[in-house]
Amino acid sequence: MRRADRLFQIVQLLRGRRLTTADDLAQRLEVSMRTVYRDIAALAQQGVPIEGEAGVGYRM
């Protein structure tokens, strides 16, 4: 999966749920948790309003 497609998928997954963990995103996208962390950081840098709580998960 290309990175652009993965970033789009992350946004879609976060929109449809209350809280989503990095582990859940990694399993759904078949990537490492480190890749999820990098992708979340890239989205946040682009201005996507993602909120994250350590040990809890991410939401939009």
Model-based region annotation:
Residues 1-60:
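Short, basic/aromatic recognition patches that contact phosphate-bearing ligands
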